Amino acid sequence: RVEVKRELFAELDALSPPGAVLASSTSGIPASAFTEALPGRARCLVAHPVNPPYLVPLVELVGAPWTAPDAVARTRALMARVGQVPVTAMKETRGFVLNRMQAALVAEAFRLVRDGVMSVEDVDACVRDGLGLRWSFMGPFETIDLNAPGGVADYAARFGPLLGAITAEQAPYDFDAATVEKVAAERRAALPSTAIEDRSAWRDRRLMALLAHRRDQPG
């Protein structure tokens, strides 16, 4: 895949106007992996969307070490003009920022099922009917800022030791086959494969309703 991107961006760099920004949509390949040898590498970056991209507005912009700040700024302005919500990573990280945050949650969810702490259905409920309700209109920093009388510093003083102890227990997780099979089996019991397409359409309708609500109730 990296080689395909290298070849494609070499063609784009040769054929496109010098002032055009070249952005790649990718979930895990940084711009530095396929643009280093390009004469126009300073105008290349990653614009990482979120699934489904036609409904979720966030776009993560990540340049290579040689990407010109103007290329990122112009891309951010364009995304904002067309109704997206651009965020900018100031340096490359493996998997990009959104995927890293999602990976931490998904890995812990699998660990909890593996260790017999909670069922697949109840883990989903913890996010759907707990964390997700707040996260649909505020991020983790604003959440903790409101969760202690003195804001973030007070939250860290009160809960930092507990959070530190929890994260110390979270060794790297390898998505072992037995746990993956268990999670998949519980999901197929809850939602047969034949119903996935309909459920995906339902998800899209719920996302549209949430977006409409957010437009009517600006934060």
Predicted feature locations:
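Rossmann-fold dinucleotide-binding core
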Residues: V21-K91, G95, N99
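Charged, alpha-helix-enriched surfaces in structured cytosolic catalytic cores
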Residues: P39, W66-D70, A104, M118-E121, ...
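Rossmann-like NAD(P)-binding element
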Residues: R1-V21, I29
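Active-site-proximal catalytic alpha-helix in oxidoreductases
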Residues: P53-V62, V82, V87-D115, A125-F141
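NAD(P)-dependent Rossmann-like dehydrogenase/reductase catalytic/cofactor-binding core
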Residues: Q84, D115, V120-G219
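Predominant activation on well-ordered alpha-helical scaffold segments within soluble catalytic domains
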Residues: S32-T35, R76, A103-R111, D124-R128, ...
